[in-house]
């Protein structure tokens, strides 16, 4: 929970709180906390367990939400023990809203965390690595053993922190950059020129 303290003045948005494993620590902080949960039973539990959150529990699908409406367009820290099956989609959503998400922390599958933090030349370096590191500083904080869970999952977990780089400018069209990165890594067997030719058309050298 302390990983959110990089920006202590900002409100917190927790994604997928479930039964409040992380929420119980977040509500003790002297900050505005909102949670987004799509599961009805979890929402009912949270309302009963954390009455102080009553007006800040949002029953919705995070991936479909307009994040600019959550805190009147103001920035916030994104956190959560993210559902492993949609963690990549959550981070793509973060990138689409990077103007209001200066920091993102949380627990994800160890394999995904390693991909996000991977450097150029690494076997795990890919789309997530390039796109997130283009705008955020990535810190792989620590590994979480599967044995701390009951029942234990089949995979290890990891906690990471991504802090937006305020000084870095790409100097190119962001939409085109994302398209080139995704196309290039999805067609690794092709030469770079052949991969991006359909995108650039006549401008491709």
Give the predicted meaning of each segment.
Residues 1-179:
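Catalytic cores of RNA-modifying enzymes
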């Amino acid at each position: 929970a302390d990983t959110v303290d990089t920006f202590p003045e900002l409100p917190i948005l927790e994604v997928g709180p479930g039964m409040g494993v992380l929420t119980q620590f977040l509500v003790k902080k002297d900050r505005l906390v909102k949670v987004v949960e799509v599961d009805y039973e979890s929402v009912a539990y949270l309302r009963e367990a954390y009455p102080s959150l009553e007006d800040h529990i949002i029953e919705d699908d995070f991936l479909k939400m307009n994040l600019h409406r959550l805190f009147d367009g103001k920035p916030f820290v994104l956190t959560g023990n993210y559902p492993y099956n949609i963690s990549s989609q959550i981070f793509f959503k973060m990138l689409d809203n990077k103007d209001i998400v200066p920091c993102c922390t949380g627990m994800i599958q160890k394999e995904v965390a390693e991909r996000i933090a991977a450097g150029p030349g690494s076997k795990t370096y890919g789309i997530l690595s390039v796109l997130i590191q283009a705008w955020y500083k990535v810190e792989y904080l620590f590994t979480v053993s599967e044995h701390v869970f009951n029942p234990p999952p089949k995979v290890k977990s990891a906690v990471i922190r991504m802090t937006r780089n305020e000084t870095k400018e790409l100097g190119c069209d962001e939409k085109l950059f994302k398209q080139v990165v995704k196309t290039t890594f999805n067609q690794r067997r092709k030469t770079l020129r052949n991969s991006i030719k359909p995108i650039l058309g006549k401008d491709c050298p």
